[in-house]
Amino acid sequence: ITTNIKKLVDSNKESIAIASTSTQTEVNENIIQILRQRFNVRNIILDSAVPVDISVVLLNGVSDSLSVDERQNLENYVTNGGNLIIGQNRLAVDIQTQQATPIISDIFELLSNYGFQIEENLVLDKTCGKVNVQQNMGIFRMAVPMDYPFLPIIQTFNEDEVVVSGLEGLRTMFPSEITLDSLHNTMILFQSSDHSSTMSEFYNLNPDPKVNPVFSQLNENGKILAARSEVLNNETGIVGQVILISDSKFFADNGGGGSPENHIFVLNAIDFLLGDSELISLRSREITNRPLEELEDDAKVQWKWANILLPSLFIVGFGFIRLRGEKNRAAMLEELYD
């Protein structure tokens, strides 16, 4: 609905760029197809200056330092009032080998200039996606789906921020915690739940809870996983904006780029950065993921016993009523024939 409305009122499409460095190879076809319904989408390399007609730049997380030209072009774009949405975490994770390696890059210094500090850790959340784990079932070996806290499902949003207003769920992969610098004009967008934790230094990525004890220790408050910053150019008075999601694969096809909920967030973010926020609340109603409310362990036990006892009590009570009715009927027949 929102796409069709926008097509009717837009005479000129804005230009959106999917930026990459000389070392990046991420595929972003899913998000590109979504964006092309409303925008002119171009792929650009940061070793050249960002074209002046680009309204918003999307950038996947980098795993190496930027070249001098790449960093300068990115900085110049934001300084001159450009809008940047970047997915960047602090560790490169290989789920196949279950290894996490710290990323060494000057991108973190650049982001710190905008008020973002990405901690060298991984955030875990009890509200999470699942992975298949091979387990022995008798003589068979089967893939069993298990919760994997390294894939937080986001349900805690800053309702004061239009970008995430009305959203109910997002999917992230191996995010890192974001710390905000109070000296900059930064705002939280979303965070993990209050059943979270972090892992640092030694990374046990095994999905089997039997060999990963941290999965039973998710009792910390929510961690910031996305925020935005307003970047003021003191000389010109122009304000650029940066939105950071601490997930390097948030736009990529092999990561969050395959999630419809994430598509809605990206479209909301672009509309907000373009000063075109009136359709955000309408679009948020298109959310396809409406998860059931999580119950505490005590509540689960109570409902379990209620499900066991109440049917039995109902049957016993119904039996007493029937027995009483039969006795009354027998008494009436005795009186009738006496």
Residue ranges and their predicted role:
Residues 1-338:
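Short, surface-exposed patches at the edges or C-terminal ends of soluble domains, predominantly
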